[in-house]
């Protein structure tokens, strides 16, 4: 559910107020906004509750993490919160540890790439897909002065430039494909340029992990690499080799959103977690 203002992690009970926000004042136009609407409609018909869980707008970061470097612009926490937090909780259970006692860095590698640092159960800082590593179709962090020059060059319209950053940026801008498997096939066939771009992606992810490790003063219990691209041994090992000096690396591949939703709400139903009732007046900022 991408169109909500910043919210805390966990489950939210879907209600009329949430639907009104998503229909009339969404903060982000995204297909995931339909999930709450569809769920609420079905739940009302059969007389049960419906929930969202860890939407992309989860924001538990401290004020210091919002400072961007330009007064008019605050950093905005829009990350793959559902999968990254689910993998952090799953990692803790796998190792018989309490998630709330761990410091974890989770990197989600998919069509977009984002990272979070989890400090004792809270996602206190982040690297979004607009300010960090490039990905198969997103440009990530770009040189700001050169970007401004390109925007005002007359070469592109606003819509074209926005698409260049999200949709035509990243790997596809260099290699004309968004398919990581195809890139690896090209590397295996001796394509040196494909290797350069793919290795640059691995390096940028590793640098973002290193950046987030400073948030907890280097006290990191584990680094988790997840998302669809984490299935790639080449990519996972390339990143791991650069960051394993910080903390042990756990590869947990896949975009496990459906599992995360199911287990999140199951924890609510079992009394392990309590769902929050969505109210605009309670939000971090509305």
Where are these regions (language model features)?
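Adenine-nucleotide phosphate-binding core of ATP-dependent small-molecule kinases
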Residues: 163-218
